[in-house]
């Protein structure tokens, strides 16, 4: 006899078989061990890219190191001077420094005296950056953190006597900005690197004593959201032990679930292997790539590091920067914009102005940028000035030139009975009509002083196909 038949209560409700099956499947998934990646590109390249990176869209790159002391030519100063012996660099040194002055003598002058990480982080936040990438070590080998394998050539032993990497990371994370660490695999003049080079990179003295210990240290110490590798081009990934490091990073590191890496892990890797593609500096594809990519570029068109001989014609304009940002995001990329601080840790006003202008633009148009996806059409037909993005069922048309007649003509969107059209930064709906030449949008009659932004306006279209 059933318990409820003798007055012990009603029968329990029947549990649907489907619910039991779903519960069982969930328990199996929960019990299943996480996928592990083997140290080969087929396995590593199959790892899904963490969502945060594609949603971020815009980041700030910071090139900062010993090269900010001479601050002349570019961040490749040491190589141009001693590696290539370029006459203009030799002349610069002879005119400005005493005989026998070495590159290491710049060390004490790299003071970072006015470096206030919270000030930097506030600026980057105001710029609308969702991630920031700092050079932990450029090709010169000087590390911006107390690396135990860079004795007397790091920011704790020489110059600032501070952990620059750690300080900036703490400031950024207080503002929920993702933190990326740039790291150069090679060092131009390190004795062990030169020894491996002499041996045609058949030995790995430098990799085992310097490169790999530093990468593991950076990950365990700072838990970065992104590792921006560089300096790979002389050697294959097998010399750098890249796949071994990345398999550890994806399987066992403290950042295994959210870390993102680029594609510079060996001379055979760029644009072929990695978490996302940089390909080369200032890479700009002509059509929508199959995989996630990032355009890295610099406000100073000539140099990544700060240089005192920069002139205004070398500086990217606000219009140029916004245009590149829009085109990059429309084609599915992220836009990483570089600035170079001074040896004192200051970000010069022209760089601040450019960053703040982007932040102002994004405060109005960010809806069309952050977390967007490429639409079925990226560039409006027969034009170079209208680019599309999308979020769900909403389409955004960003136009870079205001039509003289005040009417924007679009051929790609197909209207429906539910179509609504607005401009970001303007509260009311816009008038529109469909004509044989396409969708005609009648832009608001506003002065330059009442427009939401001065350049790059966004039309929001809902209910279109």
Curated annotation (Swiss-Prot):
Superkingdom in the source lineage: Eukaryota
Single Gene Ontology MF annotation: alpha-L-fucosidase activity
Record's subcellular location: Lysosome
Pfam families, alphabetized: Alpha_L_fucos, Fucosidase_C
Biological process terms in GO annotation: fucose metabolic process; glycoside catabolic process; lipid metabolic process
Residues glycosylated per entry: 241, 268, 382
This protein's GO CC annotations: lysosome
Known EC number: 3.2.1.51
Site (May be important for catalysis): 296
Disease: Defects in FUCA1 are the cause of fucosidosis. It is a lysosomal storage disease characterized by accumulation of fucose-containing glycolipids and glycoproteins in various tissues.
General function of this protein: Alpha-L-fucosidase is responsible for hydrolyzing the alpha-1,6-linked fucose joined to the reducing-end N-acetylglucosamine of the carbohydrate moieties of glycoproteins.
Family statement: Belongs to the glycosyl hydrolase 29 family.
Annotated protein name in UniProt: Tissue alpha-L-fucosidase
Organism: Canis lupus familiaris (Dog)
Organism taxonomic ancestry: Eukaryota, Metazoa, Chordata, Craniata, Vertebrata
């Amino acid at each position: 006899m059933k318990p409820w038949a003798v007055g012990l209560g009603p029968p329990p409700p029947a549990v649907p078989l489907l619910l039991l099956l779903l519960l069982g499947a969930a328990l199996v998934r929960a019990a299943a061990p996480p996928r592990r990646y083997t140290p080969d590109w087929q396995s590593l390249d199959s790892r899904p890219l963490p969502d945060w990176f594609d949603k971020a869209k815009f980041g700030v790159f910071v090139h900062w190191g010993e090269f900010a002391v001479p601050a002349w030519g570019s961040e490749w100063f040491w190589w141009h001077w001693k590696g290539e012996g370029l006459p203009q660099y030799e002349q610069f040194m002879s005119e400005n420094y005493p005989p026998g002055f070495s590159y290491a003598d710049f060390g004490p002058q790299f003071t970072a005296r006015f470096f206030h990480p919270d000030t930097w982080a506030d600026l980057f936040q105001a710029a609308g950056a969702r991630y920031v990438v700092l050079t932990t070590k450029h090709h010169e080998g000087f590390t911006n953190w107390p690396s135990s394998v860079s004795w007397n050539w790091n920011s704790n032993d020489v110059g600032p006597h501070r952990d620059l990497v750690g300080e900036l990371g703490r400031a950024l994370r207080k503002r929920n900005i993702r933190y990326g660490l740039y790291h150069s695999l090679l060092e131009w003049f390190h004795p062990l690197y030169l020894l491996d080079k002499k041996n045609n990179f058949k030995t790995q003295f430098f990799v085992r004593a310097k490169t790999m210990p530093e990468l593991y240290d950076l990950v365990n110490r700072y838990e970065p959201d992104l590792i921006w590798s560089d300096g790979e081009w002389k050697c294959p990934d097998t010399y750098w032990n890249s796949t071994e490091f990345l398999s550890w990073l994806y399987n066992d590191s403290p950042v295994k679930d959210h870390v993102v890496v680029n594609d510079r892990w060996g001379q055979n890797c760029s644009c072929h292997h990695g978490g996302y593609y940089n390909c080369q500096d200032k890479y700009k594809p002509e059509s929508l790539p199959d995989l996630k990519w990032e355009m890295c570029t610099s406000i100073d068109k000539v140099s990544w590091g700060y240089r005192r001989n920069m002139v205004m014609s070398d500086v990217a304009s606000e219009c140029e920067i916004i245009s590149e940002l829009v085109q990059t995001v429309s084609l599915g990329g992220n836009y990483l914009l570089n600035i170079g601080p001074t040896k004192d840790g200051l970000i010069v006003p022209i760089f601040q102005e450019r960053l703040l202008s982007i932040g102002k633009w994004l405060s109005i148009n960010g809806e069309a940028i952050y977390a967007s996806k490429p639409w079925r059409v990226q560039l409006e037909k027969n034009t170079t000035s209208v680019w599309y993005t999308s979020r769900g069922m909403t389409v955004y048309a960003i136009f870079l030139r205001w039509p003289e007649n005040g009417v924007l003509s679009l051929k790609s969107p197909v209207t429906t009975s539910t179509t609504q059209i607005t401009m970001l930064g303007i509260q009311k709906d816009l008038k529109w009509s469909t004509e044989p030449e396409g969708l005609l949008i009648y832009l608001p009659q506003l002065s330059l002083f009442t427009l939401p932004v001065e350049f790059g306006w966004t039309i929001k279209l809902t209910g279109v196909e």
